[in-house]
């Protein structure tokens, strides 16, 4: 048996149990009538016969212990997709339904709504820890990437009952702590997921993020240079840092910190120190000038964005760009001259995680206690 995956047919295993004598005879006749080639005892036919199967599990894209249930004569073979199988076998809230699965979101590579929601399901293990207990802002593209978009902070009135919220400054922010909520948002075509630097229960950040924003896509090498210079500094102070491509045109550096170990004012001491050090060392390459017209061809080191009430794109969030790019965590050895943002699309990221671990898998285990000491020393020097 096989399933449609993008433009290919993915072989998913086989079945023999569950067929009655009559059903087996019907199936054999259909195969004989439509066979294209034969290799040994194996007969090959074009896709066309749809069946419902019961199975135990999916392992390495293979179904195990499959059992025939029924022929599905009302379905076309191209409706039988791997994404549909993955979504159909999740333990989700009953109120959650996928609407308009064939709606086109990206044209090249072709990704429809079903494939996008399937991406969210497959990436949820890695993405949900960063969304957990944070006031979520999304950017929705209800008619696909080529259509209009808008920011959404409030839970809409029509949201199902399982969508949880927290009130903050007059907004009912959605709290995305589970797969059902994430997939409901995906079905609403929330393409971008922006998160604050703190949980809703806290007043202080649980991470620091530097946003390295080159003036244009061609200046991406400046982001690579800035990131590597930052790593040298962080390593010298035993600060554990994690880079990610933004999915747009830059690189972002995440630094996890212990909850309530630092205030926003204290983290500003550190971010300002790093930014000013780099622009003094490389004045022709980097700037902290907020007005774009005054930056010239220099990369903007955005340390101001790390503040209460501000947000950053969530790791593994898709971006509302022409290509289905993803804000993808990197290993530091990947931050080199070969790095290209456009490489990190939905299909690439899923394949990457099938064959490698997540670069941020230890993120929430880090406390970076040395950062507290460093900030104290910087403040002490400034007071002299």
Regions found by a protein language model. Give the residues of each.
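Signature for HUH/AEP ssDNA processing cores
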Residues: 180-246, 257-261, 265
């Amino acid at each position: 048996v096989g399933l449609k995956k993008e433009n290919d047919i993915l072989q998913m295993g086989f079945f023999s149990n569950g067929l009655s004598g009559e059903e087996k005879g019907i199936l054999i006749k259909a195969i004989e009538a439509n066979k294209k080639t034969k290799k040994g005892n194996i007969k090959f036919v074009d896709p066309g016969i749809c069946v419902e199967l019961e199975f135990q599990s999916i392992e390495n894209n293979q179904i195990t212990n499959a059992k025939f249930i029924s022929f599905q004569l009302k379905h076309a073979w191209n409706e039988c997709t791997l994404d549909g199988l993955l979504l159909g076998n999740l333990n989700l809230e009953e109120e959650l339904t996928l609407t308009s699965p064939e709606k086109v979101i990206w044209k090249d590579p072709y990704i429809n709504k079903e494939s996008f929601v399937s991406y969210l399901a497959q990436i949820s293990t890695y993405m949900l820890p960063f969304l957990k207990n944070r006031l979520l802002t999304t950017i929705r593209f209800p008619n696909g990437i080529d259509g209009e978009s808008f920011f959404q902070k409030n839970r809409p009135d029509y949201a199902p009952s399982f969508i949880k919220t927290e009130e903050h400054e007059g907004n009912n922010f959605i709290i995305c702590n589970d797969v059902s909520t994430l997939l409901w948002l995906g079905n609403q075509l929330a393409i971008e997921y922006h998160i604050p630097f703190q949980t809703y229960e806290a007043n202080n950040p649980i991470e620091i993020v530097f946003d390295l924003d080159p003036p244009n896509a061609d200046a991406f090498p400046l982001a690579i240079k800035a990131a590597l210079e930052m790593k040298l500094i962080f390593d010298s102070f035993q600060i554990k840092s994690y880079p990610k491509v933004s999915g747009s045109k830059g690189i972002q550096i995440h630094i996890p910190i212990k909850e309530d170990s630092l205030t926003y004012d204290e983290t500003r001491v550190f971010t300002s120190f790093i930014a000013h050090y780099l622009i003094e060392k490389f004045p022709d390459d980097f700037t902290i000038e907020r007005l774009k017209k005054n930056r010239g061809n220099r990369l903007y080191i955005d340390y101001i964005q790390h503040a209460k009430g501000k947000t950053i794109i969530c790791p593994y969030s898709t971006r509302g760009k022409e290509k289905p790019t993803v804000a993808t965590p990197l290993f530091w050895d990947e931050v080199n001259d070969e790095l290209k943002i456009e490489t990190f699309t939905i299909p690439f990221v899923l394949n990457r995680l099938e064959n490698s671990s997540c670069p941020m898998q230890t993120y929430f285990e880090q406390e970076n206690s040395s950062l507290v000491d460093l900030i104290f020393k910087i403040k002490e020097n400034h007071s002299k």
